[in-house]
Amino acid sequence: MTGPARSGAAIRGAGRTVARGLIFLIQLYRHMVSPLRPATCRFVPTCSQYAVDALDEYGLIRGSWLAAARLTKCGPWHQGGWDPIPERPGCRVNCQDASDAWAVRATRGESGSLV
């Protein structure tokens, strides 16, 4: 690998490292700070678990975006409830691989590129 391909791989590797660091900090919060406070999260999974899942599944950029969007829902203006991370496009319960993920083009309003 040379040139842009190599630098792209290095950037992805650095992103994974930073995402792992954020997950470590969230886990520290969950095990050191959160037990000292009363349970107030109105969502399932909790916001911290959601952030860990999003960073693990989608990586640094999109995972951070999803976690930040979830935190904006925190407050009395949102009723809470079940709110898991979104599925990857094209993957369903019985999905064995992602080879068919881009077979069908998304229609207007179905693109997952912004969130």
From Swiss-Prot:
Family as reported in the entry's similarity comment: Belongs to the UPF0161 family.
How this chain sits in the membrane, per its record, is:
Peripheral membrane protein
Q: Which UniProt keywords apply?
A: Cell membrane, Membrane
Give the UniProt entry's GO cellular component terms. plasma membrane
What task does this protein carry out? Could be involved in insertion of integral membrane proteins into the membrane.
Give compartment(s). Cell membrane
* PANTHER family according to UniProt: MEMBRANE PROTEIN INSERTION EFFICIENCY FACTOR-RELATED (PTHR33383:SF1)
Q: What is this protein called?
A: Putative membrane protein insertion efficiency factor
